[in-house]
Amino acid sequence: MSARPFSTPFDRERRVRSTLKKVFGFDSFKTPLQESATMAVVKGAEDVFVCMPTGAGKSLCYQLPALLASGITIVVSPLIALIQDQVDHLLALKVQVSSLNSKLSVQERKELLSDLERDKPRTKLLYITPEMAASASFQPTLNSLVSRNLLSYLVVDEAHCVSQWGHDFRPDYLRLGALRSRLAHAPCVALTATATPQVQEDVFAALHLKQPVASFKTPCFRANLFYDVQFKELIPDVYGNLRDFCLKALGQKAENGSSSGCGIVYCRTREACEQLAIELSSRGVNAKAYHAGLKASDRTQVQNEWMEEKVPVIVATISFGMGVDKANVRFVAHWNIAKSMAGYYQESGRAGRDGKPSWCRLYYSRNDRDQVSFLIRKELAKLQEKRGNKPSDKATLLAFDALVTFCEEVGCRHAAIAKYFGDAPPACAKGCDYCQNPAAITKKLDALERSSSWSKTCIGPSQGNGFDPELYEGGRRGYGGFSRYDEGSGGSGDEGRDEAHKREWNLFYQKQMSLRKGKEPKIEEFTPPDEDCPLREASSRKIPKLTVKAREHCLRLLEEALISNHQAAGSTHGADLQAKAVELEHETFRNAKMVNLYKASVLKKVAEIHKASKDGQLYDMESGTKSCGAAAEFSEPSDYDIPPTSHVYSLKPKRVGAGFSKGPCSFQTATELLGKSHSQKQAPEAMLEGGQEPPGWVCDLQDEDRSKPHPGYQEKALGSSVNCGDPSPEKKTKGSSQGSAKARASKKQQLLATAARKDSQNITRFLCQRTESPPLPASVPRSEDASPSCGDVPGKCTQEVGAQGHLVAVFQTEGPRERPSTCSLRDQSFPEGQPSPLKETQAEKRPRPQQGNPERRAQKRLRPSTKSSILAEAKDSTLASDRSTENKVAQEPCQLSASGTSLREAADIVVRHLTPFYKEGRFISKDLFKGFARHLSHLLAQQLSPGRSVKEEAQSLIKQFFHNRARCESEADWHSLRGPQR
């Protein structure tokens, strides 16, 4: 859809001028070129390219035609801040304009999309970013507008971002070429303020502008801007110089104390912004810093104060200014050199948009030049490592060299800028420091050449005879080198000069050595502690360079923190806080090996104490001791606690008794043993009533060593003695038999552990209902091959499993086998209502709410399945199934299945196999590489072909994609790629 049809050219011009006056409030256009560009866009017969300086009125060239058109104009802009500034300006003019970006709320986004779905949308201009234009969420809206023929124009603002030869290249702008191809019926308008001939050609090619293109370009010369360069090396007080410049540019203050304008000072780093704002404020210029390190609210407040002219000067990084439209900026100063001529021209062009005289100053320093040059080359090196060398890489260096030439060479500043952008030399009329006083600039450059910082650029003699006192032995020419022997005959005069030179050098050497002798570092002597020093091991010199005074200071910090903690917690009982502080300090001293580690540990403890005080809790000395890594005794674990990793000696089964000490034997009565076993029985029953199974059911699934903990851990957990002889018959109850079996290392225990591992892989053990049963009598022997899991509750569990059909025999007769891989457990399915053992192990310590009736859950677990089950298989088939599972795990460990593939796993595999193609340059940009990897990962996560892994499918799809395609140039390339079908 083009612009609204007009009967005659006169009618078109009349409507344009009427809208210009009625909506924008202008009687006429700012320049004839602006009027010509606007009329060309309104006509809609060809694509338009507009290149005008900042403040020349580029936005009006597309905003006015958009209001006259009957459809919607899509405007692509690089920054949300710039978009918001344009939207606010148009809303103030009562223009129906909207922005679709990530900062919209859900309600605002819903209202905007519903308006775009109308037959006649109210929105006239829709601002989006290039990322939004390429996003999948925007495509349905775009397709709807295209299908209904509701698009009037496609506008690309800041079009120089599309060129790799430009100073602000953005890869997302390259995707706009595909968008332009889809909207071939709508005229395209490209606008920029800085465009060299090379950049202009790139814009035409990348945006697929139809030839011939109506090009409107204004010369870059702005007569109201005065350019000058100041050399930091030649200024005694550079901060004072900047203050004088600010006050002169701002002019006289009004009666209320406010200035008639404002100014911007650009710095390269955040630290420089903060420092410069402080220096200017201390010298009488109200200035505030603005950079990305500030909070969003602080940045907004500083910007608003500057816009309202409460703060006349803002010191900012280069990120500030693109989204700000302020006409009365009287000066722009660059504290450091910019990265390119185009960037400097764009930033300095933010001054004087109202057409009044304004000043642009650059503070130049050789040190800044070297730093920026190093950063540019470093960035190029990183890019070249990823994508190789490109011809556009030279453009970055050439753009920076052009700005260096602008500062260092003698000549008109405006002429240097015009030469860079391909314009004819303008009539400066004393609009720069050189044209105003050429002799002064020439004198400054000569002084700069003679300054110390510039003499280092070339190693040469500073004296007539070639001797340079700053170089070793006067330098090559001063020393003479091989030239002495080339002369054939050295006279007595040469020998005399050599002798004098040698004496001078000896005197210089002796003088330097005498100076160095006085600067030898003094060895610090250790100051012994006082007699009343409260520190433990105060005279110890375990930590080098740690003084007693420093330890006493740390002790006071700990003591003060403990006192404040007792006060905050409201503790009433008296405690020797100094003794506690001494203990904490000594513990930290004993564990640290360096001074900085010691101080860091003390500060960490102080922070922990303050945190406890803030929470109103009394600081626990024992917990603090454990947290800092000191040796502490392990507390007695309960039956539901999994031993920590430090208690498990190895993941492999070990022969108990070969290297572990049994510990001292202590006497314990039978009454204590029976009471302890009774308390251990009640805990699993309470857990069953609360809707959670004891972790003992599933410990064997995770690790076979869980059934056989460390001997030292067993002794503390059981709390019973270990006799060297055989246990008495009275102790063979349900609780004591298990404890005695775990307490001694024998072949019987190894067989029990093997059976437990084998039993843990069988699904039928999860169908058993755990019920309380009386302890076995002493006369009933316990089967040596029984599983510990079933042996704990030998009553109803054994009977129910036996009723399913000779499964008990399987448990008792199967021989030991290798432990299956953990990955095979993930693929096992569990009965309905029964949680996965792995998940149960992870969540066994987490409290759960009550989940219904336990009897009803038991019925759900015992519900028969309509599919074939392991319960109906015979013994041989069960063993065969187990062997096949082991073989599969041994051949393909941890291989992803089709049903269990997650998006993250698929993404890792896709990126791993797609990266070589990216390094070969098969993707035009990194964003395309990310987009294709995301698309392929979603395809693989949704479905897989039967019998194929994620790796195989990924390789197949990548090979299919690059079969007839040399490079991936747009997202449209993979739209036809389909995922695997089942």
Curated annotation (Swiss-Prot):
Species this protein is from = Mus musculus (Mouse)
Give the region (Interaction with RAD51) as residue ranges. Answer: 653-726
Question: Which segment of the chain is annotated as a signal peptide?
Answer: none
- List Phosphothreonine occurrences by residue: T527
- PTM entry text: Phosphorylated by CDK1 at Ser-728; this phosphorylation is required for RECQL5-mediated disruption of RAD51 filaments on stalled replication forks.
Q: Which SMART domains match?
A: DEXDc, HELICc
How many cofactor units bind, and how?
A: Binds a Zn(2+) ion per subunit.
Q: What's the protein here called?
A: ATP-dependent DNA helicase Q5
